[in-house]
């Protein structure tokens, strides 16, 4: 069975609401917008809410690849279970892993994938999550024919970027942020305007900029690889995703590295 692609998610009207509902993006790939999360420092929750989003890819064998799982929701889990076998729970960077434990307890046969540094960070923060495998430079056998990947440098914010070949969709977590100013409150709104991380152009996450610049050669190689895939759209974890002109967006955002 293929994921239904008759009612596609609209990047403008369905970006946030409804939450915890699967929204097809293209054949065999969709998104789920999640509830607000809050930044925490030293165990203290800061009044800085941000939106969340996970991406779901249905592989040819019926298994589901879930990128950056949002907070667990039983009804959503049931819906996904009906679409395919929840098999791969993927952490794209060391900050997008917190809910993998919840999903793995609901789907104990799923394989949990750790991005670089995710194991250490989870342990240091006392997060209850079991990681089965580590994500390497090359895509593993489990999805290499359908999903490609590349490591994007960024210091502690570095992440694994994925590409769904069938739909020509680039899947990002934090590398690019594209916040809609009318959907966020202060001080996020001020920060977004100050750093350029807002719709319609978006921008590289500010925490990655200096590390990317200092590793310009690796950055160039990663961007050239992404451009070689000729992506048509870019799904982001935070803010409005780009439903068209993906290559142009990459060239505009990373032009300084090319």
Feature names for model-found ranges:
Residues 31-34, 66-68, 148-151, 170-173:
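Active-site-proximal beta-strand elements of phosphoester/diester hydrolases
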Residues 77-141:
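Active-site HxH/HxHxD metal-binding segment of metal-dependent hydrolases
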Residues 24, 116-159, 165, 214, ...:
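Metallo-beta-lactamase
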Residues 153-154, 160-201:
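Conserved, surface-exposed functional patches that form binding/active-site neighborhoods
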Residues 39, 47, 71, 83, ...:
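Cap/insert and terminal regions of metallo-dependent hydrolase folds
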Residues 54-58, 159-164:
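Short beta-strand scaffold segments in enzyme catalytic cores
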Residues 2-60:
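Zn-dependent metallo-beta-lactamase
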Residues 67-68, 87-93, 113-115, 171-174, ...:
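Active-site neighborhood of phospho(di)ester-bond hydrolases with catalytic His/Asp-centered motifs
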């Amino acid at each position: 069975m293929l994921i239904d692609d008759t009612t596609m998610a609209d990047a403008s009207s369905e970006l946030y609401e409804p939450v915890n509902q699967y929204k097809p993006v293209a054949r065999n790939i969709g998104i789920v917008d999640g509830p607000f999360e809050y930044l925490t420092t030293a165990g203290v929750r800061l009044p800085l809410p941000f939106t969340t989003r996970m991406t779901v890819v249905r592989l040819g064998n019926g298994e589901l690849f879930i990128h950056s799982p949002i907070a667990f929701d039983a009804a959503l889990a049931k819906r996904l279970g009906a679409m395919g076998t929840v098999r791969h729970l993927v952490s794209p960077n060391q900050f997008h892993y917190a809910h993998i434990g919840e999903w793995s307890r609901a789907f104990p046969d799923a394989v949990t994938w750790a991005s670089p540094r995710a194991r250490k960070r989870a342990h240091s923060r006392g997060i209850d999550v079991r990681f089965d495998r580590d994500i390497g430079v090359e895509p593993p056998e489990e999805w290499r024919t359908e999903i490609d990947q590349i490591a994007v440098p960024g210091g502690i914010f570095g992440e694994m970027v994925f590409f769904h070949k069938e739909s020509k969709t680039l899947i990002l977590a934090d590398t690019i942020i594209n916040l809609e100013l009318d959907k966020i409150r202060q001080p996020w709104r001020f920060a977004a305007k100050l750093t350029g991380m807002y719709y319609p152009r978006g921008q590289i996450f500010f925490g990655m900029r200096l590390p990317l610049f200092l590793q310009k050669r690796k950055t160039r190689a990663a961007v050239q690889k992404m451009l070689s895939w000729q992506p048509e759209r870019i799904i982001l974890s935070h803010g409005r995703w780009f439903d068209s002109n993906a290559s142009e967006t990459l060239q505009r955002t990373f032009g300084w590295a090319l």
